[in-house]
Amino acid sequence: MTRYQDDFYDAINGEWQKTAEIPADKSQTGGFIDLDEEIEELMLTTTDKWLAGQDVPEDAILANFVKYHRLVRDFDKREADGITPVLPLLKEFQELETFADFTAKLAEFELAGKPNFLPFGVSPDFMDARTNVLWASAPSTILPDTTYYAEDHPQREELLTLWKETSANLLKAYDFSDTEIEDLLEKRLKLDRRVAAVVLSNEESSEYAKLYHPYSYEDFKKFAPALPLDDFFQVVLGQVPDKVIVDEERFWQAADQFYNEEAWPLLKATLILSVVNLSTSYLTEEIRVLSG
């Protein structure tokens, strides 16, 4: 028998390890995996009981969970409805004519969880974890990292072509015409190139100590004068912040490339594609598969 001081892990797990097997559909096994599976099984059996009307708790949140789960599991209705449920949301974004139309709805979109291309978040301050602060980040790129956008990257064109083909097939399922698809994708790619030129690479993002750039709110607003940030934060946060921590400083220093009337057609196309991508897991099986 292995002594604890010789091999602590083997002393504890040695006997179990002799007979333990990794399931064919799993990449690992162990006590935490067993616990995870038990919790999953409990969730499934409990949800099935609630769906059958048994022992449903008198809790408004859980009652809504049951209603929502019933909708999600009604695959026949999802197939019959097709893209109909998402059409009002698509129409809302398609009818935004100008950048001013868009900025007038920024707070509304934020509170409703709709796309608005504003990468803000509230999380603990690096310098004082007891305090939550406003962080200003950046949108993500289509490709996995900014390094993929280098002209000599071997996978650049291959991956962008694959993205374009996949996106085109998906948009066809949403009844966009070929002309509309080409226009949307061209504009989306153009905005993506702008983003890729200024956001941090994965390597840069891993250097956490270098991500802390505190700005007074008044100084931060100067990065994007076209955005009604006072009104936005007053509605979303209930107050105007006194400072902003910027981890994506290059993006915000170039914010004029993204938040203005000139960039609006590119931004609008990006928002429409965001609506499509957000809805794929809630509609038909064909759309779910097309989305990858």
Please place each PLM-identified region on the residue numbering:
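Extracellular/periplasmic catalytic domains that process cell-envelope and extracellular macromolecules
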Residues: M1-Y4, F126-D128
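Active-site-surrounding "flap" and adjacent substrate/cofactor-binding loops of secreted or lumenal enzymes
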Residues: T2-D7, A11-K77
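Noncatalytic, helix-rich "gating/capping" subdomain that lines the substrate-entry/channel surface
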Residues: D48-G292
